[in-house]
Amino acid sequence: MPKMKTHRASAKRFKKTANGGLKSASAYTSHRFHGKTKKQRRQLRGTRMMDSTTVKTYAKMLSTL
């Protein structure tokens, strides 16, 4: 049986929390801010927690983290 390998693209984008959740940076933050309101830009700062149903899928890809 071959070793389980971490999906490297996902490992660079997501961090595992102490309780087993996953956090990541917000999407839509690289350019085209003139089309976003001040409130949208403010809320895009920081990190986001991944939905619990999606965490199960990504946990397999990030099994070795």
UniProtKB/Swiss-Prot annotation:
A biological process from GO: translation
SUPFAM superfamilies assigned: L35p-like
Basic residues: compositionally biased ranges: 1-16
Cellular component per GO, a single term: cytosolic large ribosomal subunit
PROSITE patterns per the UniProt record, alphabetical: RIBOSOMAL_L35
Pfam families registered for this protein in UniProt: Ribosomal_L35p
Keywords, alphabetical: Ribonucleoprotein, Ribosomal protein
GO MF entry, a single one: structural constituent of ribosome
Stretches the record annotates as Disordered: 1-24
Record HAMAP family: Ribosomal_bL35
NCBIfam families: rpmI_bact
Protein family membership: Belongs to the bacterial ribosomal protein bL35 family.
Protein's recorded name: Large ribosomal subunit protein bL35
Organism (species): Leuconostoc mesenteroides subsp. mesenteroides (strain ATCC 8293 / DSM 20343 / BCRC 11652 / CCM 1803 / JCM 6124 / NCDO 523 / NBRC 100496 / NCIMB 8023 / NCTC 12954 / NRRL B-1118 / 37Y)
Lineage per the UniProt record: Bacteria, Bacillati, Bacillota, Bacilli, Lactobacillales
